[in-house]
C-alpha cells in the first residue's frame, strides 16, 4: 500500500482541514495516554487549549479525581493584560501554586496531543518555575 493510500485511510476523506486536525490531535492524545498515567504520588498535569482559553488540571488517574485546576477563565487571569502566551504562563503559575499547596511536588506532563510550543510551552515552563517537577 502506498504512503498516500495509508494517509487517506487514516484521515476522514472529504472533511475540512479543521476536522482533520482535530481528529489527528485526538489520535495523538490517545497514543500519548496509552503510556502516561497519573498516580497519587505523581499525578498527571493535563492541559486543554481552545482558540481563546487554556485549562490545566492535575489528575490522579488511579482514583479518577481532579486534585487541582486552573484556567484562563478565572477572574484574575481574565483581567490580565497581554497575549494568550502570557495568560498561559499565568495559568502555569497558578497550577504550580495550587499543586504545592495540595502537597504535590512532581507531576507527569500530558500535552494532550498539542505541540510543545507557544502557549503549551509557556504553561509548562511557568509550572516548572513555580516549583513543579516534571
Swiss-Prot record:
Composition-biased stretches (Basic and acidic residues): 7-19
One Pfam assignment: Ribosomal_L18p
An annotated GO cellular component: cytosolic large ribosomal subunit
Region listing for Disordered, in residue ranges: 1-25
Biological process according to GO: translation
Key word Metal-binding present: no
Entry-linked InterPro entries: Ribosomal_uL18_bac-type, Ribosomal_uL18_bac/euk
GO molecular function, one term: 5S rRNA binding
Protein keywords: Ribonucleoprotein, Ribosomal protein, RNA-binding, rRNA-binding
The keyword rRNA-binding appears for this protein: yes
PANTHER family with a match to the protein in the record: 39S RIBOSOMAL PROTEIN L18, MITOCHONDRIAL, LARGE RIBOSOMAL SUBUNIT PROTEIN UL18M
Biological role stated in the UniProt entry: This is one of the proteins that bind and probably mediate the attachment of the 5S RNA into the large ribosomal subunit, where it forms part of the central protuberance.
Family to which the UniProt record says this protein belongs: Belongs to the universal ribosomal protein uL18 family.
Assembly description: Part of the 50S ribosomal subunit; part of the 5S rRNA/L5/L18/L25 subcomplex. Contacts the 5S and 23S rRNAs.
Protein name, UniProt field: Large ribosomal subunit protein uL18
Amino acid at each position: 500500500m502506498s504512503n498516500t493510500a495509508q494517509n487517506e485511510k487514516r484521515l476522514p476523506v472529504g472533511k475540512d482541514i479543521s476536522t482533520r486536525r482535530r481528529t489527528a490531535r485526538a489520535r495523538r492524545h490517545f497514543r500519548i495516554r496509552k503510556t502516561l498515567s497519573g498516580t497519587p504520588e505523581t499525578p498527571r498535569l493535563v492541559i486543554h487549549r481552545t482558540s481563546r482559553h487554556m485549562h490545566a488540571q492535575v489528575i490522579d488517574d488511579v482514583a479518577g479525581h481532579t486534585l487541582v485546576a486552573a484556567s484562563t477563565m478565572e477572574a484574575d487571569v481574565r483581567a490580565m493584560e497581554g497575549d494568550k502566551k502570557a495568560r498561559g504562563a499565568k495559568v502555569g503559575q497558578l497550577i504550580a501554586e495550587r499543586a504545592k499547596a495540595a502537597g504535590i511536588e512532581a507531576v507527569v506532563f500530558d500535552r494532550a496531543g498539542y505541540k510543545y510550543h507557544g502557549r503549551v510551552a509557556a504553561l509548562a515552563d511557568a509550572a516548572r518555575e513555580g516549583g513543579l517537577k516534571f
